[in-house]
UniProtKB/Swiss-Prot annotation:
Subunit structure: Monomeric.
Descriptive protein name: Myoglobin
Catalytic activity, reaction form: Fe(III)-heme b-[protein] + nitric oxide + H2O = Fe(II)-heme b-[protein] + nitrite + 2 H(+); H2O2 + AH2 = A + 2 H2O
Chief location: cytoplasm
Gene encoding the protein: MB
Amino acid sequence: MGLSDQEWQQVLSIWGKVESDLAGHGHQVLMRLFQDHPETLDRFDKFKGLKTPDQMKGSEDLKKHGVTVLTQLGKILKQKGNHESELKPLAQTHATKHKIPVKYLEFISEAIMKVIAEKHAADFGGDSQAAMKKALELFRNDMASKYKEFGFQG
């Protein structure tokens, strides 16, 4: 299920816009994740107290974690599918330490898609959306495979 060169170009083009404001995008992605799927908060001890949108908006820790999430994802996307060295340590911590279910990776992928669509509607048309969706699916599938290697069924 690899992406074509053109699809990777679309993914990395829109990702450049995300990287221009990692803090803003990351913060919004996590807020969207926690608001749309409140059960995901249970996996984040330091964010469990954030129950309202205002609390989430004011959280510097949430903003910092958003930068971390999108920075790691960006490193993986830039490898254009050849991401074994970047993916393995991420999968290991998410499988063995954080125990993040694959379903939650789907949820954050949805949040990423929504935030990009809201912030960059003019640059995130159907082809770009399809390419990004495919890239995020590749990421999730490869994470799920690694989870199994680490004995986590997620």
